[in-house]
């Protein structure tokens, strides 16, 4: 037991479900809609991720469990260069966990608050990257419904990634949505008349993109709308406000923003082809955009943490249930919950048991590994396909 003794690295079974013990907690970096976010490192691969954790009891008490489950269901089916992708989801008795891409460039709201002045060419590339993400979501029948600077993260190179699918909706074909959801200053006009039966579709995300792009360029939004503004006032604002565009902006950018901020969803730009065919985008190599080969005009400062540093204090000092004390707390909780001391406690435990049973466990690493294993077999089957022979020399 001397200095020559070294700790053996933990052994991981690739078929085992990922759990909390597979990660090292490094630091807290932010708050999500229903939980908090910290930086973690996976012990076997040493890869860094962001881990969002949501307290089950709080989710039950706030009736938010279904939203979490829906977000998990949606994110498991998505993978794109300009999204924040889900890698793992798991649970313990206390929390639900989502492990996603780690993006340390901060969200666009943070940079706006730091008085960053985004140049037109920078915003132009942001728009290109975001419309590719929106096109992908549209093909997957997903409406995000909360596009705004707060939900757009930058990676260390300055590329944008859409996050937070908590109020996203899956849209069956030939249907529209009538429920109102979103952040009012970024919600499209048709969303405020949806209760009258008209409904809305994918075009609402493109309106939100227009509001966001305008705000990035000017530092304020095109319409004076707050979260506290009533729906009636918002409708009146849309009907009476004439959006102004600074003369310093190029006419091409102004024309594009007008297409995104078109009140009529049938005339609004809401397809990737709309933007790609727009004259302002003639100089864009879209393959290079997708492959992140175009250099953004704004690159986050690598020498600073691009988030509010108070999150670390809240987690480690002020938070009544800090994550780094989880193991000790769970052991005590298991002992305390062996008996129900009231009907209310028993009812809560029933709900928590239901969450435990219905939670969706996910491991993208395993999904990708299984997919790659199937590929050689698929290729072999195709070479044996007699229908593939056309009697011609197909070698090029």
UniProtKB/Swiss-Prot annotation:
Changing residue 89 to F: In a metastatic melanoma sample; somatic mutation. Its main location: membrane. CDD domains: STKc_Yank1 (cd05578). One of its GO terms (cellular component) is plasma membrane. The active site is at residue 146. InterPro entries: Kinase-like_dom_sf, Prot_kinase_dom, Protein_kinase_ATP_BS, Ser/Thr_kinase_AS. Signal peptide: none annotated. Pfam families: Pkinase (PF00069). Its EC number is 2.7.11.1. It is found in: Cell membrane. Its cofactor is Mg(2+). It is an enzyme of class 2 (transferase). Residues 373-396 are annotated as: Disordered. It comes from the Eukaryota. It catalyses: L-seryl-[protein] + ATP = O-phospho-L-seryl-[protein] + ADP + H(+); L-threonyl-[protein] + ATP = O-phospho-L-threonyl-[protein] + ADP + H(+). A lipid is attached at residue 2 (N-myristoyl glycine). ATP binds at residues 29-37, 52. Keywords: ATP-binding, Cell membrane, Kinase, Lipoprotein, Magnesium, Membrane, Metal-binding, Myristate, Nucleotide-binding, Serine/threonine-protein kinase, Transferase. One of its GO terms (molecular function) is protein serine/threonine kinase activity. Residues 23-281 form the Protein kinase domain. GO terms for biological process: intracellular signal transduction. It is a lipid-anchor. The keyword Membrane applies. Belongs to the protein kinase superfamily. Ser/Thr protein kinase family. This is Serine/threonine-protein kinase 32A. It comes from Homo sapiens. The lineage of its organism: Eukaryota, Metazoa, Chordata, Craniata, Vertebrata. The gene is STK32A.
